[in-house]
A protein has these predicted regions:
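Low-complexity, Ser/Thr/Pro/Gly-enriched N-terminal "stalk/linker" regions
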Residues: 1-72, 107-115, 119-123, 127-128
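Surface loop/turn signatures of beta-propeller and other carbohydrate-active proteins
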Residues: 4-15, 26-27, 77-82, 132-138, ...
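Well-ordered alpha-helical segments within folded domains of soluble proteins
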Residues: 37-53, 85-102, 141-158
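Mid-chain, structured segments of secreted extracytoplasmic proteins
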Residues: 60, 65-95
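Boundary/linker segments of alpha-helical solenoid repeat arrays
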Residues: 77-79, 108, 183
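Hydrophobic alpha-helical segments of small multi-pass membrane proteins
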Residues: 92, 115-119, 172
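Aromatic- and glycine-enriched pocket-lining scaffold segments that form the walls
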Residues: 127-193, 198-200
Length: 200
């Protein structure tokens, strides 16, 4: 399926991007910083891989692979990523690694997948078992944090861990429903603080 305007837009983004300064995440560049490991870049790279799957155009795969390869070292460590930061947002970009590993089998991608999965093993949790959004936000569960962690978590469990963590993930969703869903509207609040220390 041809989408000329869409393809032109995506191609321009790629042409204006370098591996350190992607055009779609220009905020870092404006701050004088190189891009690191983050959900914004992860979302875009995953989109490029989906475009590659839909069109077969190798330029999308090649850019995506180069972008991630630039950040992932041979031992699986990831530039500007730290497990000990316990930032659930940084798990999201790990979804790119599943797609790339399936396409090219680079062992360093599998090692990086395992590294990110190790964060979930030690990520601080609420008493009911939900991942804290970030170590700097103790006892807080945010709705977007569910998007950041759970798809990666479930893909790992499905592909590599005989689905052992699926019940844990399900329970986290049920806790979110219990604490964050407005019964009258069916809509969800953005977050909750189990400690009740935050003003909201």
């Amino acid at each position: 399926m041809q989408l000329p305007i869409f393809e032109k837009y995506i191609d321009e983004l790629i042409e204006k991007s370098t591996l350190d300064v992607p055009a779609w995440n220009i905020e870092k560049a404006r701050e004088g910083k190189a891009a690191g490991w983050n959900y914004i870049d992860g979302c875009m790279i995953l989109a490029l891989l989906e475009i590659y799957n839909a069109t077969g155009e190798k330029k999308y795969y090649e850019f995506a692979d180069a972008f991630i390869d630039h950040r992932v070292q041979e031992d699986g460590t990831i530039t500007k990523y730290s497990v000990e930061e316990y930032n659930i947002d940084n798990v999201n970009a790990g979804k790119t690694l599943f797609a790339l590993y399936a396409l090219n089998g680079k062992e360093k991608y599998r090692k990086a997948i395992d590294l990110i999965r190790s964060q979930l093993e030690t990520q601080p949790r609420t008493k009911e078992g939900n991942f804290w959004h970030k170590d700097i936000y103790p006892w807080q569960v945010w709705l977007d944090g569910t998007y950041m962690a759970q798809p990666f978590y479930m893909e790992y469990e499905t592909r590599f861990n005989k689905m052992q963590g699926c019940i844990d993930s399900y329970k986290q969703f049920m806790n979110i429903k219990k604490h964050m869903r407005d019964e009258k509207t069916g809509l969800y609040y953005h977050g909750y603080d189990e400690s009740r220390q935050m003003y909201w």
